[in-house]
């Protein structure tokens, strides 16, 4: 009887330790994805020199086309503004007042984006 209880206890402890180890590995690997993006007002909290995601609304009258595929614009969270420089093809949903997420690095108070993601609104409208 004593041997059965001890074996059961060992199995329970091993299962508990395995579960804790698995959860720890998952959380460690998801660490940089826990905060999906920083708004312009919180960009100072992000690590400098690392790739970041910043998100906000494209400010009205801020889009400036530098060349055919190079653009600068300002995003805002209605607290602080941040200038974004991007070279590449713009997403189809990109426009003033639209929510976007830019992936890139911060350099001299300007954000150099390597990728833009346009956010659509949450309201579903069936085709008419």
Swiss-Prot record:
Periplasmic-side positions: 30-128
Record function comment: Heme chaperone required for the biogenesis of c-type cytochromes. Transiently binds heme delivered by CcmC and transfers the heme to apo-cytochromes in a process facilitated by CcmF and CcmH.
Residues the entry annotates as binding heme: 120, 124
Family classification: Belongs to the CcmE/CycJ family.
Keyword Metal-binding attached: yes
Species whose genome carries this gene: Rickettsia typhi (strain ATCC VR-144 / Wilmington)
Residue spans, topological domain Cytoplasmic: 1-8
NCBIfam families on file: PRK13254.1-1 (NF009727)
Keyword Phosphoprotein annotated: no
Superkingdom assignment: Bacteria
Keywords: Cell inner membrane, Cell membrane, Cytochrome c-type biogenesis, Heme, Iron, Membrane, Metal-binding, Signal-anchor, Transmembrane, Transmembrane helix
InterPro entries the record matches: CcmE (IPR004329), CcmE-like_sf (IPR036127), NA-bd_OB-fold (IPR012340)
GO cellular component, one term: plasma membrane
Membrane association type: Single-pass type II membrane protein
Subcellular location: Cell inner membrane
Transmembrane portions of the chain: 9-29
Protein name: Cytochrome c-type biogenesis protein CcmE
Taxonomic lineage of the native organism: Bacteria, Pseudomonadati, Pseudomonadota, Alphaproteobacteria, Rickettsiales
GO molecular function: heme binding; metal ion binding
GO process terms (BP): cytochrome complex assembly
């Amino acid at each position: 009887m004593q041997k059965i209880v001890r074996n059961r206890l060992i199995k329970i402890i091993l299962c508990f330790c395995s579960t804790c180890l698995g959860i720890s590995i998952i959380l460690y690997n998801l660490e940089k994805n826990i905060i999906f993006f920083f708004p312009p007002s919180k960009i100072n909290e992000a690590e400098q020199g690392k790739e970041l995601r910043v998100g906000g609304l494209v400010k009205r009258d801020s889009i400036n086309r530098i060349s055919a595929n190079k653009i600068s614009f300002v995003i805002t969270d209605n607290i602080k503004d941040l200038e974004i420089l991007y070279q590449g093809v713009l997403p189809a949903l990109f426009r003033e007042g639209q929510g976007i997420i830019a992936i890139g690095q911060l350099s001299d108070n300007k954000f150099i984006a390597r990728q833009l993601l346009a956010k659509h609104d949450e309201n579903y409208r069936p085709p008419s």
